[in-house]
């Protein structure tokens, strides 16, 4: 059996040749999960905060902190928009979640989402040079239920520190209320990655695929396998792009969605 390359480029070669595709997929997933656990434990997560300004002598601490920083405070006080130029706010994204719908693992408790939220911040920094902060919120109310208003209030209070908000892994229907409310209430961009990000990519792929086969979006039949936040938003985007709702079918774990279902809340 071969040893893995540091780049993991030979991952498929680490397993027996007689593995079926299903066995290979399961083995790779198990391997990556165990490797992820070991690496996260070794590094203590995958994100750190590093200063980007130089310190050329001890007195430079008086520039970056007090008394020099007072000039920054009063300037921003007089014009809040200068906070985007005089602090890291313009390059800082809040990655916010209550961890109630973490990938395929469901409700992982608030802290259980940190791995994914740090992962999103990792991608932002590595691929785009944007600083992301993982913020996992306890959204339970006094009745022990997940309350979207808890997330909304938290983001509103934290807004002055960030240039944008990335909502992540919030279960439906709470995710819709959180997104719609914050987009109206905040003066910075608010983005729901699971819905809008996935929806944009899927719509782009569908448009290009239909161009290749020479078919019209309004005349094809479209099937959605799943009725979560991603697929419901994808459906809305596809309809806005010109798809015919009467030619679309959506399944959840029980079956197709239709008006005769009595197990779905209106």
Where are these regions (language model features)?
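Residue-level detector of flexible, active-site-proximal loop/helix-junction positions
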Residues: 139-141, 197, 255
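N-terminal ligand-binding/catalytic initiation module
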Residues: 2-188
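Glycine-rich phosphate/diphosphate-binding loop of Rossmann-like nucleotide-binding domains
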Residues: 103, 111-128, 192, 200-266
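Conserved structured catalytic cores and adjacent interaction surfaces
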Residues: 168, 173-174, 185-195, 216-220, ...
